[in-house]
UniProtKB/Swiss-Prot annotation:
UniProt record, GO biological process: regulation of DNA-templated transcription
The keyword rRNA-binding belongs to this UniProt entry's keyword annotation: no
Gene3D superfamilies found in the cross-reference section: 1.10.10.200, 3.30.70.980
Example of a GO MF term: DNA binding
InterPro entries: Integrase-like_N, TACO1_YebC-like_2nd/3rd_dom, TACO1_YebC_N, Transcrip_reg_TACO1-like, Transcrip_reg_TACO1-like_dom3, YebC-like
DNA-binding found in the keyword field: yes
Pfam family, one: Transcrip_reg
Family to which the UniProt record says this protein belongs: Belongs to the TACO1 family.
Name of the protein in its database record: Probable transcriptional regulatory protein Cpha266_0538
Cited NCBIfam families: PRK00110.1, PRK12378.1, YebC/PmpR family DNA-binding transcriptional regulator
GO cellular component labels: cytosol
Origin species: Chlorobium phaeobacteroides (strain DSM 266 / SMG 266 / 2430)
Entry superkingdom: Bacteria
Length: 250
């Protein structure tokens, strides 16, 4: 919707101002370790690992850190065993939240998540309480300065494009089925069109639009969750009007 920011756009704008590289590296190392443990050390045959390594490299993680994380995942080096647990619940203004974690201590993590939620006018729900509102997809961002919308559609329609969001002023958000994400990346590479932030996303079926006051409360709870080392990703169905987004940035 023109003049509105969906959650992918809001996250991108938040990331531009967040200074959490150490925290980000911790999360990336966990993802690489888990991906290598589940699918092996060869990125060519392990799409999740390939995506995790690409993300780490795009965030300037040293290669030695990446290789060490892979070896911990495969057992070549001793490392921590992580469990992946997804929590669901509601934030302020009834916004649905999905919280993906990787932890070596389930009790600590659930206590921390519950504490963060309750302190910020949120509540944890049962498994399945909000996940039915979302679909797991692949997505990436393409700068609008690199290609027209018509050309991008022409390039990607046969590569697995499901949706193209253009509500952001700077980027298109390309949405695909997870199995088609690599094909879409290759199609963009072949057309010499740069892209950023290829990722696994949870896309809501419908968005809830918030004004600045409620949006700031939701962003506050998401920030608190993302600052927890056990939290890998947070997804929401929040949408903010451009006017409200601008007031938040003032």
């Amino acid at each position: 919707m023109s003049g509105h920011s969906k959650w992918a756009t809001i996250k991108r704008k938040k990331a531009a101002t967040d200074q959490k590289r150490g925290n980000l590296f911790t999360k990336l190392v966990k993802e690489i370790t888990i991906a290598a443990k589940m699918g092996g050390a060869d990125p060519g045959g392990n799409p999740r690992l390939r995506l995790a390594i690409d993300t780490a490299r795009s965030n300037s993680m040293p290669m030695e850190n990446i290789l060490r994380a892979v070896k911990k995942g495969t057992g070549e080096l001793e490392g921590v065993t992580y469990d992946e647990i997804t929590y669901e619940g509601y934030g302020p203004a009834g916004i649905a939240l999905i919280i993906e974690t990787a932890t070596d201590n389930r009790n600590r993590t659930v206590a921390d998540i519950r504490h963060i939620m309750s302190r910020n006018n949120g509540s944890l729900g049962e498994s399945g309480s909000v996940s039915w509102m979302f679909h797991r997809k692949g997505s990436l961002d393409v700068s609008k300065s690199a290609v027209s919308e018509d050309m991008l559609l022409e390039i990607l329609l046969d590569a697995g494009l499901e949706d193209l969001e253009s509500d952001d002023a700077i980027y298109y958000t390309v949405i695909t089925d997870l199995k088609d994400l690599e094909t879409v990346k290759k199609a963009l590479d072949a057309a010499a069109i740069p892209f950023e932030n290829a990722r696994i996303d949870m896309i809501p079926e419908n968005y809830i639009e918030l004004e600045a006051e409620d949006a700031s409360k939701v962003i506050r709870i998401i920030d608190a969750l993302e600052n927890n080392d056990d939290v890998q990703a947070v997804y929401s169905n929040m949408e903010i009007s451009e006017k409200a987004m601008n007031s938040l940035n003032e």
